[in-house]
Amino acid sequence: MLTLRKMGFAVATAMLLAACNQGGGAPENKTASAPAGASGEATAPAAGGELVVKLGTANPLTGAFAEWGKDAANGVKLAVDEANAENLTWNGQKVKFELMSEDDMADPKTAAQVADRFVDAKVSAVIGHLVTGASLPASIVYNDHNIPMVAYSVTGPKFTQQGFKGVFRVISNDKQQGDALGAYAVKTLGAKTFAVIHDKTAYGEGLANDFATAAEAAGAKKVATEFTSTSATEFGAIVTAMKGAAPDLIFYGGMDPQGAPLLKELRKQGVKAKYMGADGLKTSNFPTLAGDAAEGAFASTASVADDKMPGRTAFAEKYKKAFGGEVVAYSPYAYDATNVVLAAMKKAQSSDPAKYLPELAASQFDGITGKIGFTENGDLKDGVVTIYTIKGGKWEVAQ
């Protein structure tokens, strides 16, 4: 689930997608109506007769993922500031958007507590959270209180398989990544045998399983499965197992703090199998961590490549002007997620989910990351997966 500058800080990447899990079960259809029992306007009058519309955004603002979370929060803030600059009126009343930003620490329990605070504050919508593990418990709270939620980086399939009418995402999911990588490994890279290694997180295991299913469907044979953890620093036993299995390709489900040194050790011990991961490895730090061993590695993102984003350059300029720094990762997606909510509210002339949720579900929004529309479950329609390889120490688009 990582893209753009791709987060060049190792400690953060250690856990970011640990909760992006593989969901199961048939999803219920999403209907273009508000959840049963939706309340009225979650707003408050302000001085001068303004209608104050409260929006919530939850991101890790402290801890290992703070740089990603702050970047995403900036994207939300930029969209809200621009909306306020429009001096909108709904039904003759001036509207002011008020952003409530909370730190969920990318932690499920904290995220649920944040969700409760948003409920108490009567927010009209939530943009976030960063990871699936935090988003799942929070989404239950929002669904119970009829608050729509649009995620900008959540890739775990289960997120949109809960049957919730007010849950959406503006990025592809992990199953799409696993499917694309599995097919690419066999059909393009020619792998006849493969091994999977994962970090035992919902994210890593889910991706590894999806990759394996797709690779086997394409005709390859799995010859080994091994496990590590998000805190591992020693990989000797795994390397020994890989030497014995001798696969054509190794898929790693996890993040770069383990994925990179694992690759380095594999190469040091003479394992020449092609090496592949998903967005947990597609970071600017991976080539540095893996050194020369990184050359020829493959990874993916659940999004379009930077140069394919229609509004990437203009957004980066606005972002730098507003915040004095470069785009880190998900701020363009957070910006789009916010704007698709605002567009639905504007069209409905209301912040009441009963009125704007049908517009949100039917969105056909031209965002800076591309066209945004939603399936009945709330997934992004026509989601894109981009596959990269490292050449000369740098990530390049492979497909």
Where is each model-derived feature located?
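Extracytosolic ligand-binding ectodomains
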Residues: 2-5, 21-399
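Sec-dependent signal peptide hydrophobic core
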Residues: 5-12
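C-terminal motif of bacterial Sec signal peptides marking the signal peptidase cleavage site
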Residues: 16-19
